[in-house]
């Protein structure tokens, strides 16, 4: 949105994302396997195993970047997941792969009444509407909300399983409210994330872990994505745009602004446009949503 605003004001800016071209599998030995049983609550789950890491204090530059946004450095692996959460907006979770029983991650709803101790040492009673990240024997993490006490990365960890997933906002919101857990991860998942971004973020994190903690990316990347998200189709009329903005906006200006917001015009008539809205714009699914996200740019042309 900022890049679009700058472009409309004669100051074009390009968003540059860190390259992940160096990502590769170093060892074909099988890593942790992933099974998603509840694809409604978890539309996409990506993960990768990194073996032979050295968990230690993060370098000063990483610690400083976390401190300036109010986060306490923990160790290099956890700090990387926290850093990338704020860099790219996608929550990550790191597990000690040695503690994943059966070498398998299973994403499923909890059995009602199951007891689970979270990272803060509190025992919680789960419901069948709480999505859990489990191994073959027990839950390890409340998906998208809070980690478990016994499955996280410590200084003794040598093998890491890195999770980059997309969880359904309603599931996350209800679980977070039920347990009073308002975390950085739940805050973002509740508002909806782009499922098409999980693999890029996973690769970015894995490369940074290799850079700061060593290790080899082991086995195939796990990526369960049964129903690929497609762009939203939205129809919007010039009359409605002008009515809600309170001023007649030139047609070419409207088109230019929508293009700068990465909304593709797939067809048009004298009355309006049919758009493909990017998947990452979770909150733009109606014509009024299109006008709302365009409002600042449209008002600038008064």
Locations of regions flagged by a protein language model:
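RNA/tRNA-interacting regions in translation and RNA-turnover enzymes
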Residues: 1-299
């Amino acid at each position: 949105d900022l890049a679009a605003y700058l472009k409309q004001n004669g100051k074009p800016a390009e968003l540059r994302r860190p390259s992940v071209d160096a990502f590769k599998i170093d060892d074909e030995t099988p890593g942790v396997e992933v099974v998603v049983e509840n694809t409604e609550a978890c539309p996409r789950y990506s993960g990768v195993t990194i073996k032979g890491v050295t968990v230690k204090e993060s370098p000063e530059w990483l610690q400083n970047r976390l401190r300036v946004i109010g986060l306490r450095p923990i160790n290099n692996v956890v700090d990387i997941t926290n850093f990338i959460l704020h860099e790219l907006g996608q929550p990550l979770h790191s597990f000690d792969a040695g503690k994943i029983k059966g070498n398998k991650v299973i994403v499923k709803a909890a059995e009602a009444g199951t007891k689970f101790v979270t990272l803060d040492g509190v025992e919680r009673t789960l419901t069948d509407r709480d999505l859990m990240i489990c191994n073959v024997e027990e839950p390890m993490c409340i998906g998208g909300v809070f980690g478990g006490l016994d499955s996280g990365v410590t200084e003794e960890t040598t093998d890491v399983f890195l999770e980059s997933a997309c969880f359904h906002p309603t599931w996350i919101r209800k679980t977070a409210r039920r347990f009073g857990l308002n975390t950085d991860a739940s805050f973002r998942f509740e508002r909806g994330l782009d499922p098409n971004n999980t693999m890029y973020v996973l690769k970015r994190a894995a490369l940074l872990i290799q850079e700061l903690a060593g290790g080899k990316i082991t086995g195939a990347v796990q990526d369960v994505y049964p129903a690929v998200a497609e762009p939203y189709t939205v129809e919007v009329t010039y009359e409605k745009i002008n009515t809600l903005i309170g001023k007649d906006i030139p047609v070419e200006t409207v088109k230019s602004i929508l293009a700068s917001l990465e909304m593709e015009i797939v067809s048009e008539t004298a009355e309006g446009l049919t758009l493909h809205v990017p998947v990452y714009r979770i909150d733009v699914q109606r014509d009024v949503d299109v006008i709302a996200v365009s409002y600042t740019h449209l008002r600038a042309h008064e």
